């Protein structure tokens, strides 16, 4: 299958959405996902699946979208100006999970496929995606296990893959105005096509399939950890960083808004509750300070 085949990619993505939702429902044990299918006037559509007020997850959204358009938006051609004016097809699964318990990290994952067409020319295509972890009260064993899972799924594709995409993740999920990373990273890749369609698709599948393998053990380990108002207030404050990053820097959010995407689905990543506090500084030696001192800068975890 050397020729890019969007049909097999779409089939995988729909199955991935189903499997991830089933896995999250099992972890929660109480709530289930509601499905909301939508169509886009310019072409395409998708299904947003959202779980709210569960026993474990305050809100979890797992979105599938498949959109088409006559011309690529500015967000997609900013670093590929030669693609301006091409028609495009974009599909992917994107998820964000906001747990109730502050000891369970927030997480985000995304896998996507993009193909651009022009009469008389070969299609230009690529895969992208990754997953990342945003703890509030981090445990080093959780972070190391998360990165070990990421490294393990990369190894069949080459020894250089994990370090490369781990570094890209650290650089991408960074808030310059705060001078801190959004969390402890994971994997991030984009413009993946150099190895040909089959191998590139294999890697995208490995990342998508690896997400629950990495996240589920952390949820199981931390979901019964007792917490109080202090931890909840800090969790809500740190969720503000998620909002800041997604609305100011995230390419996917900008792409969705610029292509006339479905606003409810694009902003599904927003936490249901969040707070800001003027000039907050954690108390020295506190668990909150541990996050700032040891986890919000790139580190080698494995």
From Swiss-Prot:
HAMAP family: Coprogen_oxidas
Pfam families linked: Coprogen_oxidas
Keywords: Cytoplasm, Heme biosynthesis, Metal-binding, Oxidoreductase, Porphyrin biosynthesis
EC class (word): oxidoreductase
InterPro entries, A to Z: Coprogen_oxidase_aer, Coprogen_oxidase_aer_sf, Coprogen_oxidase_CS
EC number: 1.3.3.3
Annotated site residue numbers, Important for dimerization: 177
Region annotation (Important for dimerization) ranges: 242-277
Entry annotated with the keyword Thylakoid: no
Cofactor(s) of this protein: a divalent metal cation
Family the UniProt entry places it in: Belongs to the aerobic coproporphyrinogen-III oxidase family.
UniProt-annotated binding residues for substrate: 94, 110-112, 260-262
GO biological process, one term: protoporphyrinogen IX biosynthetic process
Stated name of the protein: Oxygen-dependent coproporphyrinogen-III oxidase
Upper lineage: Bacteria, Pseudomonadati, Pseudomonadota, Gammaproteobacteria, Alteromonadales
Active site positions: 108
Quaternary state and interactors: Homodimer.
Reactions mediated catalytically: coproporphyrinogen III + O2 + 2 H(+) = protoporphyrinogen IX + 2 CO2 + 2 H2O
GO molecular function terms attached to this record: coproporphyrinogen oxidase activity; metal ion binding; protein homodimerization activity
Taxonomy, superkingdom: Bacteria
Organism: Shewanella sp. (strain MR-4)
Major subcellular site: cytoplasm
Entry's localization field: Cytoplasm
Gene3D superfamilies listed in its UniProt record: Coproporphyrinogen III oxidase, aerobic
GO cellular component, as recorded: cytoplasm
């Amino acid at each position: 299958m050397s020729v890019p085949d969007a049909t097999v990619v779409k089939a995988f993505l729909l199955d991935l959405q189903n499997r991830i939702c089933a896995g999250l429902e099992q972890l929660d044990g109480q709530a289930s996902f509601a499905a909301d299918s939508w169509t886009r006037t310019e072409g395409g559509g998708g299904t947003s699946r959202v779980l709210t007020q569960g026993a474990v997850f305050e809100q979890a959204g797992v979105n599938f979208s498949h959109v088409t358009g006559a011309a690529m938006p500015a967000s997609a051609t900013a670093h590929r100006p030669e693609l301006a004016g091409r028609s495009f097809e974009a599909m992917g699964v994107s998820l964000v999970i906001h747990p109730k318990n502050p000891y369970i990290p927030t997480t985000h994952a995304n896998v996507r496929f993009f193909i651009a067409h022009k009469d008389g020319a070969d299609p230009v295509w690529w895969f992208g995606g990754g997953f990342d972890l945003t703890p509030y009260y981090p445990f080093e064993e959780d972070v190391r296990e998360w990165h070990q899972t990421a490294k393990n799924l990369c190894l069949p594709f080459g020894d250089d893959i994990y370090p490369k995409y781990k570094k890209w993740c650290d650089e991408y999920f960074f808030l310059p105005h705060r001078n801190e990373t959004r969390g402890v990273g994971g994997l991030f890749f984009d413009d993946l096509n150099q190895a040909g369609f089959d191998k590139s698709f294999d890697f995208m599948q490995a990342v998508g399939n690896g997400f629950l393998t990495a996240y589920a053990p952390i949820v199981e380990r931390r979901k019964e950890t007792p917490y109080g108002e202090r931890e909840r207030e800090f969790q809500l404050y740190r969720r503000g960083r998620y909002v800041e990053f997604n609305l100011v820097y995230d390419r996917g959010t900008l792409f969705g808004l610029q292509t006339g995407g479905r606003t409810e689905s694009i902003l599904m990543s927003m936490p249901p509750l969040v707070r800001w506090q003027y000039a907050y500084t954690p108390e020295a030696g506190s668990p909150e300070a541990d996050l700032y001192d040891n986890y919000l800068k790139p580190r080698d975890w494995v």
